[in-house]
Design a protein with these regions (language model features):
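C-terminal alpha-helical interaction appendages
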Residues: 1-27, 54-60, 64
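Small-residue helix-packing motif on alpha-helices
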Residues: 32-36, 56
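Surface-exposed aromatic
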Residues: 40-47
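Anionic N-terminal interaction surfaces
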Residues: 49-90
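Long, compositionally biased, phosphorylation-prone intrinsically disordered terminal regions
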Residues: 78-85, 120-125, 224, 228-240
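Phosphoinositide-dependent membrane-docking surfaces
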Residues: 93-99, 105-129
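Mixed-charge, low-complexity intrinsically disordered segments
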Residues: 123-164
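Extended, charged low-complexity segments
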Residues: 151-263
Length: 263
């Protein structure tokens, strides 16, 4: 019979300071402080994954010693997260959120909002551009010297058309809203009209996105992820690092487990 494996997770909504969690990881996994911190910025509140019963007990005991709320769940019991409904338009007040999904309008109660999770995800695209390059000063000087020496009118060089690869870096802002009935709505700031902000709507999608987040914070008692707290607390960078959307979803899973534990 295969031995059970466990996931250890922080069971409170807001993560403790990472340096506190790092002390647990240092002792449990025999890591130096830097290694523990590097692990934590990509673990999204999980302190152990697929660990055996003895390691589970060790990590939970260390958390208890440091007054860190933590719990475990077996690999087999991990819940599945619902597929996202990506929306481009919505309207809401303190009671109801109405959104459009495939030309159909759906409404859902704000009081049933359980998880709010935000992540800034950097994307890098490469495109080819045509550019005209003029002869540089060295080339011009050499050709001028040849003309003076030989009296042959070879000119100072011609413009050249070259094709170069240019890297473009962009940041996409994602916001997931998870409700009691498992509905998971996703907003991409670059593809959302923000008309729900009415007179507060600005030209900048980043400003609009932040205003939307603040309004949701005021309307809801939902659990919020680390990056959402960073945003509303005015931090310039996020505590955790999000390379792709699956990182955000991993943190959402941790919040779902914590919410279930504390319900």
């Amino acid at each position: 019979m295969e031995e059970k494996s466990f996931f250890i997770f922080v069971s409170q909504e807001k993560l403790p300071e990472l340096k506190e969690l790092a002390e647990v990881i240092q002792k449990a996994d025999n890591k130096i402080f830097y290694e523990a911190m590097s692990y934590l910025v990509k673990s999204y509140g999980f302190l152990g994954e697929k660990v055996d019963f003895e390691k589970r007990k060790e990590i939970l005991d260390l958390c208890l010693q440091k007054n860190i709320k933590a719990d475990s769940i077996s690999n087999e019991e991990l819940p599945a997260i619902a597929k996202t409904i990506e929306i481009k338009k919505a309207d809401f007040d303190s009671e109801i959120l109405t959104y459009e999904n495939q030309q159909l309008k759906e409404s859902i109660a704000i009081k049933d909002l359980e998880i709010i999770a935000y992540a800034p995800i950097q994307t890098e695209n490469t495109k080819k551009v045509r550019q005209i390059e003029k002869p540089n000063m060295v080339e011009k000087a050499i050709r001028m010297g040849i003309m003076i020496t030989t009296a042959i009118p070879i000119g100072t060089g011609k413009n050249k058309e070259v094709i170069k690869e240019v890297k473009e870096i962009d940041v996409e802002l994602y916001l997931d809203l998870i409700f009691k009935n498992k509905t998971r709505i996703r907003i991409n700031a670059n593809d959302f009209d923000f008309s729900c902000l009415k007179e507060e709507k600005e030209l900048s999608s980043m400003i609009n996105f932040k205003r939307l987040c603040f309004r949701l914070k005021d309307y809801s008692q939902a659990y919020k992820n680390s990056a959402f707290y960073d945003l509303i607390e005015g931090k310039l960078t996020t505590t955790l690092k999000y390379d792709n959307i699956s990182d955000l979803e991993k943190e959402e899973l941790r919040l779902i487990l914590a919410k279930t534990k504390n319900s």
